[in-house]
């Protein structure tokens, strides 16, 4: 969090310590069902321990035109490639919808549940997912590129970025 705050001025920050999240399933459940209660702005930047802002000058207000933006998953079919949640920007509206009774829960990671399992439901509610062309400037995870992105996700990228 300190690495992100060093480069960017947020409208507020919340560091949540309770309840203890000790599994992938518990993390997904918290993000999908509880996170919206802690958001006091129109958007939330999700930053897991293995990702953060690397190019603050790469920020674009274009990112705020979408309810969900995260790194491209190149192994998914076109139209479903935007999805990594480890460093992602989400609207409060999206976070409220993931806690609704109509959202279908599974044991998949929360980002898969949002971007694949419930995508049609969310889009029918007016949720907009960023297109690949925009997401590539927001963050990267597995996709190698020369684009200077706003942030990244994945400890496997630390060496590549010279962060060791």
Enumerate the predicted regions with their spans:
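Catalytic core and acceptor-binding pocket of nucleotide-sugar-dependent glycosyltransferases
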Residues: 80-164
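A short acidic, often aromatic-flanked loop/helix-cap motif at beta-alpha or helix-coil junctions
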Residues: 18-27, 76-77, 135-139
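Short, solvent-exposed loop/turn segments at secondary-structure junctions
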Residues: 19-21, 50-53, 74-76, 93-95, ...
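Short beta-strand-to-loop acidic/aromatic patch adjacent to the donor-nucleotide binding site
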Residues: 41-54
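Alpha-helical elements of Rossmann-like donor-binding domains used by nucleotide-donor carbohydrate transfer enzymes
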Residues: 3, 30-34, 58, 68, ...
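Active-site-proximal specificity loops/subdomain of glycosyltransferases
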Residues: 1-42
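Conserved donor-nucleotide/metal-binding helix-loop-beta segment in metal-dependent transferases, i.e.
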Residues: 51-82
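Short, conserved loop/helix-junction motifs that constitute active-site signature segments
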Residues: 38-40, 60-64, 90
């Amino acid at each position: 969090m300190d690495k992100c705050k060093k480069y960017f001025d947020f409208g507020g920050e919340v560091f949540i310590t309770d309840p203890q999240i000790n599994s992938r399933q518990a993390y997904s459940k918290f993000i999908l069902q509880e996170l919206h209660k802690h958001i006091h702005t129109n958007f939330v930047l999700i930053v897991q321990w293995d990702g953060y802002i690397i190019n603050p000058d790469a920020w674009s207000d274009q990112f705020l035109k979408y309810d969900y933006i995260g790194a491209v998953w190149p192994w998914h079919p076109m139209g479903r490639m935007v999805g990594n949640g480890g460093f992602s920007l989400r609207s409060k509206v999206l976070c409220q919808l993931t806690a609704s009774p109509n959202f279908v829960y599974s044991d998949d990671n929360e980002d898969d549940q949002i971007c694949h399992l419930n995508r049609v439901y969310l889009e029918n509610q007016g949720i907009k997912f960023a297109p690949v062309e925009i997401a590539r400037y927001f963050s990267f995870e597995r996709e190698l590129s020369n684009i200077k992105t706003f942030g990244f996700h994945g400890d496997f990228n630390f060496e590549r970025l010279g962060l060791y």
